[in-house]
C-alpha cells in the first residue's frame, strides 16, 4: 500500500491522535507511505503533530473553514478564527507541505455576497504565504452547496437556488484567477 488514511467525522478531536500518529510513523517510517487525514479543524493540526506526519511522504491536507467570514462561521458555530486558519496553513508550508485544500459551503443560512467575497479575499491572502524550500504551493478551493440535514439547527432552512449557486461559483472563479489557486 502507498497511502494510509484515517477516517472519521472529526479526526482532530481524537484525544490520542498524536500517540496514534507516532505509532503509525514508527511502523511505516522506512516505506514510501503517505498519511492522509480527512478535513481537520484549523488549530487541531498543530505544528508538533504536523512534524510527526512530516516523517513520511506528505500529501496535501484539507482544512474546512466552511465560510469565508468570521460572521458566517459564528452563525454556523464553526469555532475557528481566521488567525487559526492562517497559522495552520503557515505551519504546513513551513514544514514542507505544498498543497492545501480549503473546503467552503455555498448557500449557508444568512449568507450574503460579502461572505462570498470573504472567501476570495482569504484565498488570495493565503496564496501569498511563502513556502519553505523549493517548489510552488497550491491553494485548492472546494466549494459545495449547503444541504440542510435533519435534526440540525438548520434543518428547516431553504437550500440555495441553483442559479444563485452557479452565480456564486462563477464570481469566485472570476475573483480567483490567481497563480497558485485552484477552484472546484
Q: What is the meaning of each model-derived region?
A:
Residues 1-101, 105-140:
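Conserved SAM/AdoMet-binding glycine-rich loop
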Residues 93, 116-184:
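Auxiliary Fe-S-binding modules of radical SAM enzymes
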